[in-house]
Amino acid sequence: MPKICTFLGISIYMYFDEHNPPHFHALYNDFRGKFLLPSLNYTAGNLPPRIIGLVIEWAELHKEELLDNWNRIKETGKYKKINPLV
């Protein structure tokens, strides 16, 4: 599972064997969350509201890169790191 970014203690992952629709996972301490692409809807998890907001803020800035990584991982298993929020 590639870690594509880390910022403010939040790690962003995309898994190689995941199903559609496109999405990514955020981990923060013992909390986890799943966000859909391109809508950025938070669909599952137990992340604190403040962390959800930070993840969405970051993802809005990098939506195209996230979608590109989703396609790359599915097609080739390769991905690119994405810059952090700060």
Tell me what each language-model feature is.
Residues M1-V86:
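Basic nucleic-acid-binding interfaces
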